[in-house]
Structures are given as structure tokens and as C-alpha cells.
Amino acid sequence: GADLHSTAVWDEEKGKWILNGEKWLISHTDCSQFSYVICVTDPDKKGDDRLSAFFVPMDKPGFELVPMPHMMGCKGAGHAGLKFTNLKLDPIYLLGEEGQGMKVAMHSLAVSRVHIATSNLGISQRMFEMSIARARDRVTFGKPIIKRQAIKMKIANMQMMIHALRCLVYDFAQDFDIDQHNDYIDEKAAIAKLFSIDTVRLVSDEMLEIFGGDGYFEDSPYGPTELLYRDCRAMWLEEGAPTVQRITIAKGIEDH
């Protein structure tokens, strides 16, 4: 989460870092062999300087996967909690230098956030295409609903948001390819992720209205509307909630 409480204390006698703490709602734990963890290594310091990053093999003694309640969507993502109890790490497992944890985190988060934005783009495009097909086939009062002005407004809004999101994702990808360490990467990644949430939310809501009751069935004959509607809700939270994205964007503007 955004509030970091896990700690790593240097044991001078043993020459190892000792990790204690918990991380909640971690994805893909069912197929991973390692994780990277941001810990407080110097509580006396303020701000980002107190944080460090570690590479943590998941077979280390003191590492525990904590089962989570079943989620309403993303059934195949393998979510779990991580618990560290006096987990010992040699110095080679420190990523970068001590005090660089936030730098490591933000660099990886920028890529992960755009992965989420790209996923939302794909989900939105799929829902849009399904909505167009259904609007052409669904007939009310003698004509397809795609001919009705209210439905046209929905379709236009969906297309507008999807096109804008695609431009944001491509813009980030271009900048990242040119220089992945430029000063605007974190800010642009947060913008893309945040806008992708607004996009997938609007598109999923409009899709459900276009499908009507048929879109609310688990086994709808017209496509996986219910599954997509549930799965895309997880995107609000992954790699930082909307409020965290706004803080990142504002901080980028302030720093520049």
C-alpha cells in the first residue's frame, strides 16, 4: 500500500537485514518465485530517505503467503498477502543503495501503471465493440437502438474516451523508449492510469445500459459483459488508487 510500515533492520553481528511486516493485496503470488519489497530501513530519517528496496525470494524462511477472501473479479490473478517474520537477507538483496527505495519503486510503478492503463484500453475497446454489435442487433419499437439519438451519444462518448486513452498510452510509450529516466515519466504514467480508470468506468457503465438486462447475466449469450464489468473494477486499486495518482501528478507539476 501507499502507507509503508514493513521494516528492515541491519543486524551487524549476523551481517544481514532482518525484515518484519506485512503487505496486503499482492497480485500473481500463485506463480511468482520472488518479490521486491519497499521497507523502512531508517525510521529516524524523514521522507523517502528512510525507505529501501529489497529483492526477496519467496522460498526464504520467514516468508509467508496469507490467503485473502475471494475477490469479485480478476479470479485468475492469484492475489494474497505477504508476511515477513524475521526474514534474513544478505546485503546482495538490497536493490540499489540504502535510502533509494522510493526511487526504485517509482521507476517500476511507472511501467506497472501504464500496464494497467493498457489493460483498461484493451478492456474498453472490447466492451465498445460488443456494445456496437449489440446496438445493431437489439431492436426496440421497430428499429435498432443504434439508430436512436440517446444511444448515439453513448457510443460517441465511449469512442472519444477510448481514443484519448490510446493517445496517452502511446505518448508515454514513446517518451519511455526515448529516455526512461526523464523527469516526466512518473507524472505521465499517473495521468495515463488515472484517465484509464475514468475511461473503463464510463465504457463499462454505458455498455451495461446498451445491453440492458441481458448484460447483467453471468452467462449472457451476447458476450462476457458481467465478467468484464466486474474485472475492470479492480483497476481502481491496482498500482495506486485514484487519489494516489492525483498526488503523483500534482507533485510532478510542483517539482517542475
Give short role names for the model-derived ranges.
Residues 5-7, 34-38, 53-55, 81-86, ...:
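Conserved hydrophobic/aromatic beta-strand scaffold that supports enzyme active sites
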Residues 16-65:
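A short core secondary-structure module
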Residues 22, 87, 213-214:
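Well-ordered beta-strand scaffold positions
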